[in-house]
Amino acid sequence: MNGTEGPNFYVPFSNKTGVVRSPFEYPQYYLAEPWQFSMLAAYMFLLIVLGFPINFLTLYVTVQHKKLRTPLNYILLNLAVADLFMVFGGFTTTLYTSLHGYFVFGPTGCNVEGFFATLGGEIALWSLVVLAIERYVVVCKPMSNFRFGENHAIMGVAFTWVMALACAAPPLAGWSRYIPEGMQCSCGIDYYTLKPEINNESFVIYMFVVHFAIPMIVIFFCYGQLVFTVKEAAAQQQESATTQKAEKEVTRMVIIMVIAFLICWVPYASVAFYIFTHQGSDFGPIFMTLPAFFAKSSSIYNPVIYIMMNKQFRNCMITTLCCGKNPLGDDEASASASKTETSQVAPA
């Protein structure tokens, strides 16, 4: 084995020289230089500085403007709530541990940080699944006369939390575990050991199949069908030009969110899968640290995409920031609000 396994940790460094110490008790400067830990801390500080205000603003603006409280926006707001969980439950912890060079909060703190990071990522993934299904049902119309309403949105939000908890909670109950990963300053699922006494192998397989592969299959199926339907409708001119444009723009926004999610999380999932399927292989701490910390940037991109591609929300945000007055005028926002009734969300 090219790493060192302890009772509640796995350090990707051989202990042949006797330098390996518990990541809960001693700085891990034998894994990387102190300046590299400082860089991680600076990165986490940047994510907190950007992630909190932009996600909080998304929630606040929606509360302030009734026109934004539409069913589909509930799912988008769910993403903002998940991101805030990651910021407060995960990023602040990782910032502090990176400054110290090891996970100073012990196994309990590791469980908390790992839980919130996993919960936030899974809520985001399952929210994108709900958005993909909504787009498929609204645009492809497999069920005639279906309208995505408030009850559907609430059920969709509840579904994302149930599925996310089904992934994030088991390690707290003894099925798998959360351990420090990479440079040992942040925590995640144990992909490094089989650990039969906690059935770790079965949980990792369950997680990859149920909470990664299946959501990806659903998302790609829905958007594959959607692309064909949009092209066919455009060719046959079955919808009005305004409706077609509105649906295309809403769909484009959601697709960009999916692509951004894949860019952030696929590297992490791929590295985790490689480590799990190559138990005991030789890999350095940076190998897992880079994709793990890159995945954390997902807390920023969803609200940014939403703000950039949604004129109605953008106008409401400007009105809120300018103390109730929009220097650009509110006509554009009103026009955008009435573009599409089917999707119940204003496109860009």
Curated annotation (Swiss-Prot):
Positions on the Extracellular side per record topology: 1-36, 97-110, 174-202, 275-286
Residues where N6-(retinylidene)lysine is found: 296
Any Gene Ontology CC annotation: photoreceptor disc membrane
Cytoplasmic topological segments: 62-73, 134-152, 225-252, 309-348
Keyword Transport on entry: no
GO BP terms, alphabetized: absorption of visible light; cellular response to light stimulus; G protein-coupled opsin signaling pathway; G protein-coupled receptor signaling pathway; phototransduction; visual perception
Keyword terms: Acetylation, Cell projection, Chromophore, Disease variant, Disulfide bond, G-protein coupled receptor, Glycoprotein, Lipoprotein, Membrane, Metal-binding, Palmitate, Phosphoprotein, Photoreceptor protein, Receptor, Retinal protein, Sensory transduction, Transducer, Transmembrane, Transmembrane helix, Vision, Zinc
Modified residues (Phosphoserine): 334, 338, 343
Residues passing through the membrane, by range: 37-61, 74-96, 111-133, 153-173, 203-224, 253-274, 287-308
Motif ('Ionic lock' involved in activated form stabilization): 134-136
Modified residues (N-acetylmethionine): 1
Glycosylation sites (chain numbering): 2, 15
Residues with the Phosphothreonine modification: 340, 342
Disorder association: Defects in RHO are a cause of autosomal dominant retinitis pigmentosa (ADRP). The phenotypic features shared by dog and man include a dramatically slowed time course of recovery of rod photoreceptor function after light exposure and a distinctive topographic pattern to the retinal degeneration. This disease was identified in the English mastiff breed.
Subunit field text: Homodimer. May form a complex composed of RHO, GRK1 and RCVRN in a Ca(2+)-dependent manner; RCVRN prevents the interaction between GRK1 and RHO. Interacts with GRK1. Interacts (phosphorylated form) with SAG. Interacts with GNAT1. Interacts with GNAT3. SAG and G-proteins compete for a common binding site. Interacts with PRCD; the interaction promotes PRCD stability. Forms a complex with ASAP1 and ARF4. Forms a complex with ASAP1, RAB11A, Rabin8/RAB3IP, ARF4 and RAB11FIP3; the complex regulates Golgi-to-cilia rhodopsin/RHO transport in photoreceptors.
Protein's UniProt name: Rhodopsin
